[in-house]
Amino acid sequence: MATEGLHENETLASLKSEAESLKGKLEEERAKLRDVELHQVAERVEALGQFVMKTRRTLKGHGNKVLCMDWCKDKRRIVSSSQDGKVIVWDSFTTNKEHAVTMPCTWVMACAYAPSGCAIACGGLDNKCSVYPLTFDKNENMAAKKKSVAMHTNYLSACSFTNSDMQILTASGDGTCALWDVESGQLLQSFHGHGADVLCLDLAPSETGNTFVSGGCDKKAMVWDMRSGQCVQAFETHESDINSVRYYPSGDAFASGSDDATCRLYDLRADREVAIYSKESIIFGASSVDFSLSGRLLFAGYNDYTINVWDVLKGSRVSILFGHENRVSTLRVSPDGTAFCSGSWDHTLRVWA
């Protein structure tokens, strides 16, 4: 028995070293293709002009830290979730609250709007993803119509509907992502590969979007094929947890924001990191990132209460937006690109334009 154990250990060690040497060879091959940096290519591109954006609306109503938010496809409504256990649907034009749900747990870390605008999904420390249909009958009890869709073995960190109301993608502290059928609550596909908590995910922007990207506490960003459940690309250049990932509008690249105080851009076709957005003066982590509709700007919320706006091509900072009185936890550009909304630990959401 002892010799068997020894053989197993030797085999494992040799497999590990083989994997490491293959990794090294892959890195060498990747390095050969690195002929030019993005900012060098962008030198001939005209610089951006004067950039002015300010808070147009402040949404107040949460009794604790705002943890997540999402826009409705109608470009007007916003859903937000908070540490107070409440999920609120807002009209961003009038700042009125249209719906409010009290969850059975605090720390509602994830919320999402269904593509049809007729339902919302949310979850957090209850390890579940719950879907609530939205109706405008004021007497109807939303909680009674709740559907428990996803069950993880640890907290729910992110959720997103696919291109229909019928399927939902979740990320969890149990180190997995999963695809669920909303109607039956059945698990359709699970995605294993992260070595620690998965903190964020984003769906590829195409209509046939069969891939998504996830990031987590193992400092890895992974691109997944939803049909096979396999990881098709992985990027490991961050030095700390990845808090946010977001696809470039074309779907050919994605950005990430991390506790290492940098945001990074990864090109999927070049299979490598092509830009780092950082400054020596930025020492706090980036909690949330999103692109402008054109893809030229990257908005990033930080733990030092600011929002930095980066020129994606040139890698330079175009603007800093002040207003929040605590760390910015979530940030999303509206579907028509005319505004973006940020949520913060100061209990408020702000709409900027």
From Swiss-Prot:
GO cellular component: membrane
Keywords: Membrane, Repeat, Transducer, WD repeat
Gene3D superfamilies xref list: YVTN repeat-like/Quinoprotein amine dehydrogenase
Signal sequence region: none
Predominant place of localization: membrane
Entry annotated with the keyword Repeat: yes
Entry-linked SUPFAM superfamilies: WD40 repeat-like
GO MF terms, alphabetically ordered: G-protein gamma-subunit binding; protein-folding chaperone binding
Intracellular or extracellular location(s): Membrane
Coiled-coil annotated spans: none
Pfam families in the record: WD40_Gbeta
WD repeats: 61-100, 103-142, 151-192, 194-236, 237-276, 278-320, 323-352
GO biological process terms held by the UniProt record: G protein-coupled dopamine receptor signaling pathway; negative regulation of voltage-gated calcium channel activity
Keyword DNA repair annotated: no
Quaternary structure and partners: Component of a complex composed of RGS9 (isoform RGS9-1), GNB5 and RGS9BP; within this complex, the presence of GNB5 stabilizes both itself and RGS9 and increases RGS9 GTPase-activating protein (GAP) activity. Interacts with RGS7, forming the RGS7-GNB5 complex; within this complex, the presence of GNB5 increases RGS7 GTPase-activating protein (GAP) activity. Interacts with GPR158; promotes the GTPase activator activity of the RGS7-GNB5 complex in absence of glycine, in contrast GTPase activator activity of the RGS7-GNB5 complex is inhibited in presence of glycine. Interacts with RGS6.
Protein role: Enhances GTPase-activating protein (GAP) activity of regulator of G protein signaling (RGS) proteins, such as RGS7 and RGS9, hence involved in the termination of the signaling initiated by the G protein coupled receptors (GPCRs) by accelerating the GTP hydrolysis on the G-alpha subunits, thereby promoting their inactivation. Increases RGS7 GTPase-activating protein (GAP) activity, thereby regulating mood and cognition. Increases RGS9 GTPase-activating protein (GAP) activity, hence contributes to the deactivation of G protein signaling initiated by D(2) dopamine receptors.
Family membership noted in the UniProt record: Belongs to the WD repeat G protein beta family.
UniProt protein name: Guanine nucleotide-binding protein subunit beta-5
